[in-house]
UniProtKB/Swiss-Prot annotation:
One of its GO terms (biological process) is defense response to virus. The gene is csm2. It comes from Mycobacterium tuberculosis (strain ATCC 25618 / H37Rv). InterPro entries: CRISPR-assoc_prot_Csm2_III-A. This is CRISPR system Cms protein Csm2. Disruption phenotype: Deletion of the entire CRISPR-Cas locus (cas6 to cas2, Rv2824c to Rv2816c) decreases resistance to plasmids encoding spacer elements about 6-fold. GO terms for molecular function: RNA binding. Belongs to the CRISPR-associated Csm2 family. Keywords: Antiviral defense, RNA-binding. CDD domains: Csm2_III-A. Encoded in a type III-A CRISPR locus. The keyword RNA-binding applies.
């Protein structure tokens, strides 16, 4: 079973449970945008392919994306909490060689960013 559900937009409401400071979420928009920009490149590549199975090069990029998420998590506790609560490492691992899985992951990341923007008073 995939970590990211069919209703990934509803699942993205996990943002509501992130730790907050006095003026908004501990996770900054910049920190989230770093993770989102890493996924955007993969989204573009996956969309160009009609094959339901990811090519080796793209699977390697998904694995490298996991490394980058781990690295960013190690740099900032707010990112680590976000990655854990949103189950992003598990979701990346669950992609395997599925093109649809990668596209769903990328859309989930976009949904997370959208909810952060919507809910964070600093972004208004």
């Amino acid at each position: 079973m995939s970590v990211i559900q069919d209703d990934y937009v509803k699942q993205a409401e996990v943002i509501r449970g992130l730790p907050k400071k006095k003026n908004g979420f501990e996770l900054t928009t910049t920190q989230l945008r770093v993770l989102l920009s890493l996924t955007a490149q993969l989204f573009d590549e996956a969309q160009q392919s009609a094959n339901p199975t990811l090519p080796r090069q793209l699977k390697e990029k998904v694995q490298y994306l996991r490394v980058r998420f781990v690295y960013q998590s190690g740099r900032e506790d707010a990112v680590k909490t976000f990655v854990r609560n949103a189950k992003l490492l598990e979701a990346l691992e669950g992609i395997g060689d599925s093109r649809d899985g990668l596209l769903r992951f990328c859309r989930y990341m976009e949904a997370l960013a959208a909810y952060k923007k919507y809910l964070d008073p600093k972004d208004k």
